[in-house]
């Protein structure tokens, strides 16, 4: 009995040394499956905007046609993050949650030329000396939400600039003319009042 027990114990020890543990086999198989791949977060740009890679999927319209409804090519943008301003405690002081998106407007061929020209005139205060249109967002505590807000601002700008200019009706033109006349009349009235006040001060000193 003792000899058989010793034999069984020796065989079990040999199997333990010769056979790899099942977890290592699983790890090796998993490593072979993911070898050559790259980990991407659920909030990576490729997963948040899967249809926005390259200029082929971007806004490109012939002539003066209306701008399309496709997404923005994220790989054509320069995206950075920095500290937010305003209240927020330690989260504001330690986390780079503010998103900044910029791109060169004149060379953005994924936007139609007439739309780019109109955007350059309408939003000239957002364009730096290098010709880059800069947008920022810090309304949220999270980077990906602020980035999404910046992209939505670009969409709104493109949609606004894509609207064709409409001629005002006769009623609107007459109303606009009346408003301008009233503004000029009020401006001249205030100017006369200020002139009378200055004249009265000079008379009082004499």
From Swiss-Prot:
Protein's UniProt keywords contain Heme: no
InterPro entries on file: Mito_Release_Factor_mL62, Pep_chain_release_fac_I
Any single GO CC term annotated in Swiss-Prot or TrEMBL for this entry: mitochondrial large ribosomal subunit
Key words of the record: Hydrolase, Methylation, Mitochondrion, Protein biosynthesis, Ribonucleoprotein, Ribosomal protein, Transit peptide
Subcellular location: Mitochondrion
Chemical reaction(s) catalysed: an N-acyl-L-alpha-aminoacyl-tRNA + H2O = an N-acyl-L-amino acid + a tRNA + H(+)
PTM note: Methylation of glutamine in the GGQ triplet by HEMK1.
Catalytic EC class: hydrolase
One of the GO biological process terms: mitochondrial translational termination
GO molecular function (one): peptidyl-tRNA hydrolase activity
EC number: 3.1.1.29
Domain of life (superkingdom): Eukaryota
Cited SUPFAM superfamilies: Peptidyl-tRNA hydrolase domain-like (SSF110916)
Modified residues (N5-methylglutamine): 90
Transit peptide: 1-29
Gene3D superfamilies, alphabetized: 3.30.160.20
PANTHER family given in the database record: LARGE RIBOSOMAL SUBUNIT PROTEIN ML62, PEPTIDE CHAIN RELEASE FACTOR
Stated role: Essential peptidyl-tRNA hydrolase component of the mitochondrial large ribosomal subunit. Acts as a codon-independent translation release factor that has lost all stop codon specificity and directs the termination of translation in mitochondrion, possibly in case of abortive elongation. May be involved in the hydrolysis of peptidyl-tRNAs that have been prematurely terminated and thus in the recycling of stalled mitochondrial ribosomes.
Family the UniProt entry places it in: Belongs to the prokaryotic/mitochondrial release factor family. Mitochondrion-specific ribosomal protein mL62 subfamily.
Subunit field text: Component of the mitochondrial ribosome large subunit (39S) which comprises a 16S rRNA and about 50 distinct proteins.
Name of the protein: Large ribosomal subunit protein mL62
Gene source species: Bos taurus
Lineage start: Eukaryota, Metazoa, Chordata, Craniata, Vertebrata
């Amino acid at each position: 009995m003792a000899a058989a027990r010793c034999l069984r114990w020796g065989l079990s020890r040999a199997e333990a040394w010769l056979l790899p543990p099942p977890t290592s086999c699983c790890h090796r198989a998993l490593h072979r499956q993911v070898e050559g791949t790259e980990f991407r977060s659920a909030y990576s740009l490729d997963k948040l905007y899967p249809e926005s890679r390259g200029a082929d999927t971007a806004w490109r319209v012939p002539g003066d046609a209306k701008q399309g409804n496709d997404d923005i090519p994220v790989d054509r943008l320069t995206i950075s993050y920095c500290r937010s301003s305003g209240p927020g405690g330690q989260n504001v002081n330690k986390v780079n949650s503010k998103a900044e998106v910029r791109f060169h407007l004149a060379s953005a061929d994924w936007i139609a030329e007439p739309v780019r020209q109109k955007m350059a005139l309408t939003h000239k205060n957002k364009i730096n000396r290098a010709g880059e249109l800069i947008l920022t967002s810090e309304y949220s505590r999270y980077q990906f939400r602020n980035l999404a807000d910046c992209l939505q601002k670009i969409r709104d700008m493109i949609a606004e600039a894509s609207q064709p200019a409409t001629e005002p009706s006769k009623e609107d033109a007459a109303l606009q003319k009346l408003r301008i006349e009233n503004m000029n009349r009020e401006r001249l009235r205030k100017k006369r009042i200020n002139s009378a006040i200055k004249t009265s001060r000079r008379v009082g000193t004499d």
